[in-house]
């Protein structure tokens, strides 16, 4: 037969084919690297060379849990604008922060969030992860009544309920020689508050004095978020991402969704019949029945889950860092404690309104908010073709700002690496220090700005002031000796921050 006359497909032919493929791919990578380094629209911006030719630099630091520090270090080394990926740049100036995230003229397209940071990995970004500006505005509009001043005042009793229970637990356990785990107890407090305020869900972490299943699952899924995001940067490796995710993390994703869906369905059926109105009330269907449409239900799941996480992780980080920096600065802690104890004759006088009158308390909270790393992702957005701090950024280029770099820059803040609450005081305050008068406070936007400004800004301040005032009115805080804690070295973050262990003693000063 004719086909038998053809020579066999021998090993030599296979070797030649493989050689051709390798040479061709090497040529492709070389020419692409040269183009990205010297001819790409972003080639004029400085930065690590490996970041200019590949996403490897980005992925390495993100997977190591050190992304905010890597970007801040690059900006410190290379200047105000740094290329951090082939098609991505980071800025450090307050003007760039305003241009990228601030409000824009209605006739201009907003800088839209990148889809790569849509943790939901589907068309339902909910609120926080929603990349489409129009859909984000619609959800934000629906939720806005839940964050009005009147609505927040109605939630204050819930806030006190959990903070008082935290104080009760510390009165019993906090004075022991070995102290208590600061991140553990703060996590429990914040997840209790957030779940109840988000959609009347009781976690009972403080009551039961143990990690609720939801929090354990959330922690287990922490690193998986970044692994998933990086797989989107390397599409050819996406099928292999399961090899890099622990079995527990994969199971966690399924369990957390199923458990949350059940809780959400229960909440929907209780519309208007709950102990207090929560943030989710505005989105519940009038018929009090879970939507039969899968897409609509998925959207509600996303929003509910994001409300819970947004009300848990940022406040927990804020509380944790504030106490840490106060303990590292005993004179500041002493000054704040005296302000609080002299302002209130008894514990019950402490409310969101009365605590807001304490200038040094607010200054300490502002300073910890400034100096802590802030958001993990840098909030990457896509340029519509616009000016950023005097430079035209072509359409399609991904931009982000580094809150950590802004805070660390001596061009923005004097003694930028030091915890100095005095920088936030007014001139008429006894502790005002004129050396901080030239600080560029426009670089301090911890809740973002413009269309994406955090809706929970006000309640976050309420929580933080009341928490710190009640804790320092009641306790003398001490860090257990012998701990070698270096935040610049030990802190890690993936989907959320992994806070280093700190043992703290809460010694009761007064009887509550």
From Swiss-Prot:
Annotated function: Cytochrome P450 monooxygenase; part of the gene cluster that mediates the biosynthesis of wortmanamides A and B, reduced long-chain polyketides amidated with a specific omega-amino acid, 5-aminopentanoic acid (5PA). The PKS modules of TwmB are involved in the synthesis of the polyketide backbone, whereas the non-canonical C domain of TwmB is a bonafide condensation domain that specifically selects 5PA and catalyzes amidation to release polyketide chain.
Cofactor(s) of this protein: heme
Heme in keyword set: yes
Organism the protein comes from: Talaromyces wortmannii
Annotated residues for binding of heme: 454
PANTHER family assigned to the protein according to its UniProt record, in alphabetical order: CYTOCHROME P450 (PTHR24305), CYTOCHROME P450 MONOOXYGENASE ASQL-RELATED (PTHR24305:SF210)
PROSITE patterns, A to Z: CYTOCHROME_P450
Gene name in the database record: TwmD
Protein name per Swiss-Prot or TrEMBL: Cytochrome P450 monooxygenase TwmD
Keywords: Heme, Iron, Metal-binding, Monooxygenase, Oxidoreductase
GO MF, one example: monooxygenase activity
Enzyme Commission identifier(s): 1.-.-.-
Similarity-based family: Belongs to the cytochrome P450 family.
UniProt keyword Iron present: yes
Pathway: Secondary metabolite biosynthesis
A Gene Ontology biological process term: biosynthetic process
Recorded superkingdom: Eukaryota
């Amino acid at each position: 037969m004719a086909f038998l006359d053809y020579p066999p497909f021998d090993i030599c032919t296979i070797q030649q084919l493989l050689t051709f493929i390798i040479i061709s791919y090497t040529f492709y990578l070389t020419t692409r690297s040269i183009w990205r380094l010297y001819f790409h629209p972003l080639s004029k911006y400085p930065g690590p060379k490996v970041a200019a030719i590949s996403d490897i630099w980005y992925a390495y630091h993100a997977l190591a849990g050190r992304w905010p520090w890597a970007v801040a270090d690059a900006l410190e080394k290379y200047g105000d604008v740094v290329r951090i990926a082939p098609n991505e740049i980071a800025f450090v100036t307050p003007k760039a922060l305003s241009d990228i995230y601030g409000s824009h003229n209605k006739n201009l397209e907003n800088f839209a969030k990148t889809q790569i940071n849509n943790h939901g990995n589907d068309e339902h970004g909910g609120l926080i992860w929603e990349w489409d500006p129009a859909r984000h505005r619609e959800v934000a509009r629906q939720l806005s009544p839940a964050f009005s001043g009147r609505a927040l005042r109605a939630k204050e009793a819930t806030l006190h309920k959990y903070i008082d229970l935290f104080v009760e637990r510390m009165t019993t356990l906090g004075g022991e020689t070995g102290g208590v785990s600061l991140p553990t107890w703060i996590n429990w407090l914040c997840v209790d508050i957030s779940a109840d305020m988000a959609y009347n869900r009781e976690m009972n972490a403080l009551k039961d004095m143990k990690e609720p299943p939801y929090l354990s699952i959330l922690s287990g899924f922490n690193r998986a978020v970044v692994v998933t995001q990086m797989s989107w940067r390397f599409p050819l490796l996406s099928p292999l991402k399961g090899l890099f995710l622990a079995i527990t993390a994969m199971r966690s994703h399924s369990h957390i969704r199923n458990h949350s869906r059940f809780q959400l369905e229960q909440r929907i059926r209780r519309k208007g019949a709950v102990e207090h109105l929560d943030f989710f009330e505005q989105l519940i269907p009038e018929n009090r029945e879970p939507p039969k449409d899968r897409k609509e239900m998925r959207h509600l799941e996303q929003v509910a889950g994001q409300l819970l996480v947004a009300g848990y992780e940022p406040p927990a980080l804020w509380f944790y860092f504030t106490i840490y920096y106060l303990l590292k600065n005993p004179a500041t802690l002493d000054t704040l404690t005296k302000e609080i104890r002299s302002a209130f004759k008894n514990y019950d006088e402490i409310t969101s309104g009365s605590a807001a009158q304490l200038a040094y308390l607010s200054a300490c909270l502002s300073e910890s908010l400034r100096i802590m790393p802030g958001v993990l992702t840098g909030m990457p957005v896509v340029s519509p073709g616009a000016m950023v701090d005097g430079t035209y950024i072509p359409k399609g280029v991904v931009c982000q700002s580094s809150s950590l770099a802004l805070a660390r820059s001596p061009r923005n803040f004097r003694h930028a690496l030091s915890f100095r609450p005095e920088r936030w005081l007014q001139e008429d305050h006894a502790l005002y220090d004129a050396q901080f008068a030239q600080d560029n406070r426009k670089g301090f936007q911890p809740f973002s700005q413009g269309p994406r400004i955090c809706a929970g800004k006000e309640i976050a301040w309420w929580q933080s002031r009341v928490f710190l005032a009640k804790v320092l009115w009641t306790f003398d805080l001490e860090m257990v000796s012998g701990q070698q804690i270096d935040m610049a070295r030990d802190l890690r973050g993936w989907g959320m921050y992994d806070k280093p262990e700190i043992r703290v003693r809460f010694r009761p000063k007064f009887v509550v």
